[in-house]
Amino acid sequence: MKEILITNDDGYESEGLKKLIKMLTKEFKAKITIVAPASEKSACSHSITLTKPLRFVKVGKRFYKLDDGTPADCVYLALHALYKKRLPDLVISGINKGANVGEDITYSGTCAGAMEAVLQGIPAIALSQFYKKSEKELDYKNALQITKKIIQNIFDKGFPLEKKEFLNINFPAKSKIKGIKICKAGKRVYNFEAHSNVNPRGVEYYWLAAANLDFEDEKNSDIALLKKGYATITPIMLDLTAYERMKKVKKWLKANDE
């Protein structure tokens, strides 16, 4: 029997997580464990908690919330505390409410859950559902169908990537999708705002907000294809070295020494 570990960054009560658990329980004969943050941890990136203890709080059969933990905490502690005899065959992070595309990947707690898994040697996928602000309820039907297909492929054929690589998968908001595209991550144009105010004690504070997020016009990027109605799959690697720039930096450093 396969073993699956699930986490997310929207918290243990999120709709996307509930829908994912229901589908996996119905479609796969697998031992499923869920460890999710006790509260929403969106945009927490790959942070881990080093300054205080964390505890598992059981909320169901093999279902735990991690008190004030991040997605990376959830995966790391689950692997080291809950899996004594055998590690999971797959870690799934999601389904996130909102896309994780372009450089958003570096901010994403959803993607960080998958990152932590592959750092620990476990194949992983990150799942995110794009939606429009006008939508009152998210339709996860397409996301669940595609996720089922991808997981079945992984179990039947093995994971398609090397070590320390994961699949970042995004689903479009449209009810009828055009298909699935393997593509590169796009490039965001960021514009963050810092709103200042004063609390009742007279102390100034700031509240960050993302405003007018846009993207560069790249025809075959995850962002562009997602907006056209395609589900996108982007292989992500954790090797951050800019190899093509190493010679340039070496020459630059040598020139500075002369």
Curated annotation (Swiss-Prot):
InterPro entries: SurE, SurE-like_Pase/nucleotidase, SurE-like_sf. This is 5'-nucleotidase SurE. Its cofactor is a divalent metal cation. Pfam families: SurE (PF01975). Keywords: Cytoplasm, Hydrolase, Metal-binding, Nucleotide-binding. Belongs to the SurE nucleotidase family. It comes from Campylobacter jejuni subsp. jejuni serotype O:2 (strain ATCC 700819 / NCTC 11168). Nucleotidase that shows phosphatase activity on nucleoside 5'-monophosphates. It is an enzyme of class 3 (hydrolase). Its EC number is 3.1.3.5.
